[in-house]
Amino acid sequence: MLCAARKCLNKTFISVRLNAFSCLAELNFRHTWYCSKKETPYQLERLQEEDIEETFICGKGPGGQKINKTSIVAQVKHIPTGIIVRSQDTRSREQNRCIARKRLTEKVDEFKHGNDSLLARKVQRIVKKKKQREKKSKRKYGNKIDDQDSSLNNNEAKQDVI
């Protein structure tokens, strides 16, 4: 028998698990507790339909006559902030509409939260991983990489002199 309980306290999930073997017999009762802290995943806020204005306009660019005469470009405007997003990624009007709405929610999130937005967090995570890779390579290879770079720069300097 396995009993599990989850509680949400201040954006932190605490998981508790209780293993019970042969609950009827008091002597053979065994239980294990563990707690783990996990942050809740970042959720983009849903935009209100009243705040969004959608229009479909004719496409521009390569694609010939078909793209120039059909209205497949989705243009979505967030009225309170004035942010406008266009999408012409696919040939389908509905897919372009979905893509434009997704981009608009990301832009509004970035506008409202700044460095705390989803895109900023992704960039911070990428920068952090890049620094970790560089640190690991320096630990592994030492100054060999720096020596190679300096020798290349010295060779270029010698060629400039000649």
UniProtKB/Swiss-Prot annotation:
Residues 128-162 are annotated as: Disordered. Its main location: mitochondrion. It is found in: Mitochondrion. Pfam families: RF-1. Residues 128-142 have a biased composition (Basic residues). GO terms for molecular function: peptidyl-tRNA hydrolase activity; translation release factor activity. SUPFAM superfamilies: Release factor. Keywords: Mitochondrion, Transit peptide. The keyword Ion transport does not apply. This is Uncharacterized peptide chain release factor-like protein C1105.18c, mitochondrial. It comes from Schizosaccharomyces pombe (strain 972 / ATCC 24843).
